């Protein structure tokens, strides 16, 4: 976990409620490449923003600091009231700082190097129709 600061209530940059952004693979090919790489290496690899895109946005009454504290004792999916698939990425953003978690076979792990802004610029690739 990385060190976070408690954002004061009076901070003008603070967003209430916080945003929960869920990222998924931008294409089936990106998902397959990721899965095959994990299998061939025999271990999980971190998420690469160029392979992901924003799939859903929700709201959360906790700020990033409180969320990071609570996930130590409460399951992520219970806090967010959502079921996430393997290798999805979730970001809780309160306007000042983010907590980014990556779902692995062993549970959620922090993914502070995931470039969420880059992933939000990507678009989901549509399947090409067969000619």
Predicted regions and their residues:
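Extended boundary segments
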Residues: 1-59
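General helical secondary-structure elements
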Residues: 2, 54, 68, 116-124
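Short intrinsically disordered terminal tails
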Residues: 5, 125-131
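Intrinsically disordered, low-complexity N-terminal regions enriched in serine/proline/glycine
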Residues: 22-24, 51, 64, 101, ...
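Short linear sequence elements within intrinsically disordered, low-complexity coil regions
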Residues: 28-30, 57, 70-72, 107, ...
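Short, conserved turn/kink motifs that form compact alpha/beta structural patches or helix kinks used as
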Residues: 43-94
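Intrinsic disorder/low-complexity segments
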Residues: 50, 112, 120, 130-131
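Short, compact, well-ordered microdomains
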Residues: 81-124
